[in-house]
């Protein structure tokens, strides 16, 4: 059949360089292939004319009895040289232009690893730059040889014989699609499990269902957090509550503390008026001091409740981080408000010091309890 087809071509005109003929592979050698095209002698396809990418041996591309479309690149009396890659390239450019125009995604097999990226055979040489292989950094591409990748054409220039492909672009499209799907499945108020992906100074990014949401530092714990890395680590599983979802900007706000019982939920059974407790001074303000008596639970010691003597400014006798004893005066769970007193705790516990040394005698000036408390607070501050 091949001979008949080519006989018809040769009957109508003499074979010329540039003609396209059909041939059957009669012999596959290491560096060339012999093909019967109905000419008086078998044509030869040099290994360099088999493909548009580097190949080690001819058998990597063709096999015995395979039917090929070939272009005549040299024709002399007993010398017929043919090219498979020239025909492949002509067809390839037409197909590649269609794929480039439509943004079509298609599979390719990596033929070679070169400096700067990957080489594929598309009928013409295609190149995937290292920066366009994956969304993440790849140090060694050795394992990519022979691998099949989904790609799209990002640059096409026939005059320069330039075909640039991207696998990264396909991965990003898939990730974006999954992200939109994940976002659409999340609703404000949902409590879901996530994985800590990244930690920053302002919070933590947590992956929930394939999409990252931000847990602001203020939403990590009911207790004050200076650095997210103090309480969280990458890869940690956490329960989060969805605070808000913005499908347009693809932003998700999450809260770890909102997914946990609040420190005030069981406060009624733990703290009651009259209790004497140890606490830590967390904040000093002009009207008093906020003292933490349980993790995440602070009460106010009004400036009038710091000592029996007049205290103009709380920082005169107290400092941040200082440990103090306080008496619970009032507990208002609904308002999350607790009133505390340092001076009453001193009075009730009698400061645990022997104050007999301060008792006045006939020859000494009198002392007031306010002086004693003020002196003790100053000692604690030191």
From Swiss-Prot:
Q: Which SMART domains match?
A: S1
- Give UniProt keywords alphabetically: Phosphoprotein, Repeat, Ribonucleoprotein, Ribosomal protein, RNA-binding
| CDD domains associated with the record | S1_RPS1_repeat_ec1_hs1, S1_RPS1_repeat_ec2_hs2, S1_RPS1_repeat_ec3
Q: InterPro entries per the record? A: NA-bd_OB-fold, Ribos_protein_bS1-like, Ribosomal_protein_S1-like, S1_domain
Gene3D superfamilies assigned: Nucleic acid-binding proteins
Q: Which processes are annotated in GO (biological process)?
A: translation
A GO CC annotation given for this chain: cytosolic small ribosomal subunit
Q: Which PROSITE patterns match?
A: S1
What residues does the S1 motif domain cover?
18-85, 103-168, 189-257, 274-343
Q: Any idea which residues bear Phosphoserine here?
A: 244
Gene Ontology MF terms: mRNA binding; structural constituent of ribosome
Q: Does the keyword Ribonucleoprotein apply?
A: yes
Extract the Pfam families matched here: S1
Q: So what family is this one in?
A: Belongs to the bacterial ribosomal protein bS1 family.
Q: What is this protein called?
A: Small ribosomal subunit protein bS1 homolog
Q: Which gene encodes it?
A: rpsA
């Amino acid at each position: 059949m091949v001979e008949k087809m080519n006989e018809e071509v040769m009957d109508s005109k003499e074979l010329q360089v540039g003609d396209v003929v059909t041939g059957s592979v009669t012999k596959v050698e290491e560096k060339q292939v012999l093909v019967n095209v109905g000419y008086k002698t078998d044509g030869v396809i040099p290994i360099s004319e088999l493909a548009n990418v580097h190949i080690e041996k001819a058998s990597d591309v063709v096999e015995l009895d395979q039917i090929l479309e070939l272009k005549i690149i040299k024709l002399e009396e007993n010398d017929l040289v043919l090219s498979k890659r020239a025909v492949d390239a002509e067809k390839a450019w037409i197909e590649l232009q269609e794929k480039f125009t439509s943004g079509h995604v298609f599979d390719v097999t990596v033929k070679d690893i070169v400096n700067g990226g990957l080489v594929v055979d598309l009928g013409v040489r295609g190149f995937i730059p290292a920066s366009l292989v994956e969304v993440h950094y790849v140090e060694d591409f050795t394992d990519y040889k022979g691998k099949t990748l989904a790609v799209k054409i990002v640059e096409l220039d026939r005059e320069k014989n330039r075909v640039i492909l991207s696998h990264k672009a396909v991965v990003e499209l898939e990730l974006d699609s999954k992200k939109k799907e994940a976002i659409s499945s999340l609703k404000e108020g949902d409590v879901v499990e996530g994985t800590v992906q990244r930690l920053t100074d302002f919070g933590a990014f947590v992956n929930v269902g394939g999409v990252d949401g931000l847990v602001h530092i203020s939403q990590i714990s009911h207790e004050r957090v200076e650095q997210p890395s103090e309480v969280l680590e990458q890869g940690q599983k956490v329960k989060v509550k969805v605070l808000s979802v913005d499908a347009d900007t693809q932003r998700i706000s999450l809260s770890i503390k909102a997914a946990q019982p609040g420190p005030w939920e069981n406060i009624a059974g733990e703290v009651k008026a009259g209790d004497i407790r140890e606490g830590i001074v967390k904040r000093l303000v002009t009207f008093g001091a906020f003292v933490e008596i349980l993790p995440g639970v602070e009460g106010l010691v009004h400036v009038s409740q710091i000592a029996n003597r007049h205290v103009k400014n709380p920082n005169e006798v107290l400092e941040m981080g200082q440990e103090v004893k306080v008496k619970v005066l009032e507990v208002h769970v609904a308002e999350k408000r607790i009133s505390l007193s340092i001076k009453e705790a001193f009075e009730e516990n009698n400061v645990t010091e022997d104050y007999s040394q301060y008792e006045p005698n006939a020859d000494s000036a009198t002392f007031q309890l306010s002086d004693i408390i003020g002196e003790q607070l100053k000692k604690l501050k030191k």
